[in-house]
């Protein structure tokens, strides 16, 4: 399955990174100074357990030393507040497919639940919300938060919702981990490379410095009311639509009218990201 294939890829990535590290360094305690595994959403979270497995089983470190290294080597980016987008595995399947990795997860969970009970004695609701293993499921997001030295959202509002609502219990316990990193795009890829006609037009207006200093594009405001600049901009937009229509015809055999409105989503179509109909 795709899910299991993804797990094997994460394991291979961890193994390769450690092999490369050991070529140049002898002390694994130096790993956090050289390597960070950024878990981009919950799908790569098995990296936590795989790194622990290698450090304990293959490098023969104590659990405490391995955990100290791991928790300084992994960080977690949360992309959504929607529960269905946070990966969960049925314990039965996870245990059968990855028996040793599951044992590691089980021990991480056991120790963390002890922490919860020390902090909130007798509060089963906290355990229910925060445990990695609960109600027959492996909750990958919980493992990412427990292990990661950093937990970030991708917009200010998103991060505040995580802290105050969706992940509030974790924020209450680990406030120092939470921070915001606003998502964005790079003008080098999405303008200079992807839209050469518009990139050339911008360079003619404000110079080439915008390629490395995005703030320079604000100088284009001076042309906002210029009929000539507006016409040039419109011509570039239409030329790009004609180019896309030609590509669609050549690759998909579909005729597209370049004078129609193009509503394009460059994104994988998943249940929680599929575009909704426009009015």
Predicted regions and their residues:
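Function-dense linear segments that define catalytic or interfacial modules
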Residues: 1-2, 6-36, 184-221, 236-239
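Structured ligand/cofactor/substrate-binding pocket environments in proteins
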Residues: 1-21, 35-46, 142, 146-161
């Amino acid at each position: 399955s795709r899910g299991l294939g993804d797990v094997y890829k994460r394991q291979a990535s961890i193994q390769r990174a450690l092999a490369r590290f050991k070529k140049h360094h002898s002390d694994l305690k130096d790993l956090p100074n050289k390597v960070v595994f950024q878990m981009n959403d919950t799908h790569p979270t098995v990296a936590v357990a795989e790194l622990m497995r290698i450090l304990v089983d293959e490098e023969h470190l104590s659990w405490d030393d391995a955990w100290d290294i791991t928790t300084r080597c992994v960080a977690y980016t949360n992309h959504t507040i929607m529960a269905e987008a946070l990966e969960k595995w049925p314990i039965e399947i996870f245990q059968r497919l990855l028996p040793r990795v599951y044992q590691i997860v089980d021990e991480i969970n056991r120790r963390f639940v002890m922490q919860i009970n020390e902090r909130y004695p007798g509060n089963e609701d906290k355990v229910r919300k925060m445990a990695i293993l609960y109600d027959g499921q492996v909750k990958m997001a919980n493992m990412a938060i427990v292990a990661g030295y950093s937990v970030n959202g991708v917009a200010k509002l998103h991060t505040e919702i995580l802290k105050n609502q969706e992940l509030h219990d974790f924020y209450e316990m680990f406030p120092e981990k939470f921070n915001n990193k606003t998502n964005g795009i790079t003008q080098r890829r999405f303008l200079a490379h992807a839209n050469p006609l518009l990139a050339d037009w911008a360079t003619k207006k404000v110079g080439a410095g915008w390629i490395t200093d995005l703030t320079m594009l604000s100088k284009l405001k001076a042309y906002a009311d210029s009929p000539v600049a507006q016409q040039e901009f419109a011509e570039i937009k239409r030329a790009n639509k004609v180019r896309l229509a030609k590509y669609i015809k050549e690759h998909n055999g579909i005729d597209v009218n370049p004078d129609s409105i193009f509503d394009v989503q460059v994104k994988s179509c998943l249940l929680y990201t599929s575009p909704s109909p426009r009015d």
